[in-house]
């Protein structure tokens, strides 16, 4: 399968080069393809700030901030704070890569919120450590356990100290909800600092997941390591950027690139802004660790919401003081929670969502959008009126 995919990529590259040489029709490349997140924010006329935060275990994370919108720049008073946390293989650009009137980060800023966007360890913008380098295996020895235990507390506490606020609204997408459910159920002091949890396409159990990722997850751990190594998994690269700006801007291949975005999550291509595909693909995937993917593989195999299994009783005892990984209990989380799910979501399957809903102690709202898949929550053309306006209304209701 790996060779077939490589062959397909080579064919696309050769065909693109031939097409360009013979005058094949390309659409204009969006300027954001070569921008970082701060530059994208500034490009759309919003104020942009960037901060580096060190976690308890030494990782250095990048936080992006939009302190106010274009419409309310004269209001210097404190604003309610929103923290946006991306999903698996993603980064903070997810919240600002659509047009300004359809990206949640920009919409919240214009609605009067102080918007902060996190970057999980190991992605494009969080590849530094106090003592380790990305060339060392030790740097990549993490999964969503550490993102919940270290990344979220460090980021949220920094934001509260910087803004002087006592609480934040937390918006998570996909794995951003996973680490939220873990952190807010395991760390009561952190949970008290969350005014409301907005869970978009939440993923806790993957018992009914139909994504190709689930098939990958059923492979033996040793085979996954043999295929992908021990370090990073699907990082953003110069080659991926080249594909995004050359292959994905070709009139004929643009739709193929759009469909590749849906390959792991479900198909709803009519709800994707095809003129933005080059921006999406030059920022995502943004990478994670192979160990994080192994953790998701374990979730598929064991069908449990639990910490990473280190593979032996001795190693588990070293990490957890017990011979098996501890389980996470969503019911222990008391944060008011609103959930949105999609009827065609291959990752956050309807049946898994129904199980999760019974476990949320303080569920204040749930809506299922029948036609939506996993990426509609961040890039859907109809997301502003079907989702984002409702999020803002709930924030104002529970302020």
Swiss-Prot record:
GO terms for biological process: lipid catabolic process. GO terms for molecular function: sterol ester esterase activity. Glycosylation is not essential for catalytic activity. It is found in: Lysosome. It catalyses: a sterol ester + H2O = a sterol + a fatty acid + H(+); cholesteryl (9Z-octadecenoate) + H2O = cholesterol + (9Z)-octadecenoate + H(+); a triacylglycerol + H2O = a 1,2-diacylglycerol + a fatty acid + H(+); 1,2-di-(9Z-octadecenoyl)-glycerol + (9Z)-octadecenoate + H(+) = 1,2,3-tri-(9Z-octadecenoyl)-glycerol + H2O. One of its GO terms (cellular component) is lysosome. Monomer. Catalyzes the deacylation of cholesteryl ester core lipids of endocytosed low density lipoproteins to generate free fatty acids and cholesterol. Hydrolyzes triglycerides (1,2,3-triacylglycerol) and diglycerides (such as 1,2-diacylglycerol and 1,3-diacylglycerol) with preference for the acyl moieties at the sn-1 or sn-3 positions. Belongs to the AB hydrolase superfamily. Lipase family. This is Lysosomal acid lipase/cholesteryl ester hydrolase. The gene is LIPA.
């Amino acid at each position: 399968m790996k060779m077939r995919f490589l062959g397909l990529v080579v064919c696309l590259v050769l065909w693109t080069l031939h097409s360009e040489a013979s005058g094949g029709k390309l659409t204009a490349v969006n300027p954001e393809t070569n921008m970082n997140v701060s530059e994208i924010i500034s490009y759309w006329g919003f104020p942009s700030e960037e901060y580096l935060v060190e976690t308890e275990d030494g990782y250095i994370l990048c936080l992006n901030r939009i302190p106010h919108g274009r419409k309310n720049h004269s209001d210097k008073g404190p604003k309610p704070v929103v923290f946006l946390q991306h999903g698996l293989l993603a980064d903070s650009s997810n919240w600002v890569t659509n047009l300004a009137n359809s990206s949640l980060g920009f919409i919240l800023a214009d609605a009067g919120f102080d918007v902060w966007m996190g970057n999980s360890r190991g992605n494009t913008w969080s590849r530094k450590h106090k003592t380790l380098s990305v060339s060392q295996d030790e740097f990549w020895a993490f999964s969503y356990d550490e993102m919940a235990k270290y990344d979220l507390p460090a980021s949220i506490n920094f934001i509260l100290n910087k803004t002087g606020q006592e609480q934040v609204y937390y918006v998570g997408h996909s794995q951003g909800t996973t680490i939220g459910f873990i952190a807010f159920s395991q760390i009561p002091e952190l949970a008290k600092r969350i005014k409301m949890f907005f869970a978009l396409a939440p993923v806790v159990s993957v018992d009914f997941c139909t994504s190709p990722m689930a098939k990958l997850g059923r492979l033996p751990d040793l085979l996954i390591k043999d295929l992908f190594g021990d370090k990073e998994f699907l990082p953003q690269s110069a080659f991926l950027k080249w594909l995004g700006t050359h292959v994905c801007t070709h009139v004929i291949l643009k739709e193929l690139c759009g469909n590749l975005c849906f390959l792991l999550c479900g198909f709803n291509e009519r709800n994707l802004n095809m003129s933005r595909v080059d921006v999406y693909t030059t920022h995502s995937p943004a990478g994670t660790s192979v160990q994080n993917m192994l953790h998701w593989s374990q979730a598929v195999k064991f069908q449990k919401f639990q910490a990473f299994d280190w593979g032996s009783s001795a190693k588990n005892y070293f990490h957890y003081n017990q011979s098996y990984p501890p389980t996470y209990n969503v019911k222990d989380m008391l944060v008011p929670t609103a959930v949105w799910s999609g009827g065609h979501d291959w990752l956050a399957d309807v049946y898994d969502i129904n199980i999760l809903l019974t476990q949320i102690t303080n569920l204040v709202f749930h809506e299922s959008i029948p036609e939506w898949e996993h990426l509609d929550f961040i890039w859907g053309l109809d997301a502003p009126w079907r989702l984002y306006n409702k999020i803002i209304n709930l924030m104002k209701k529970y302020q």
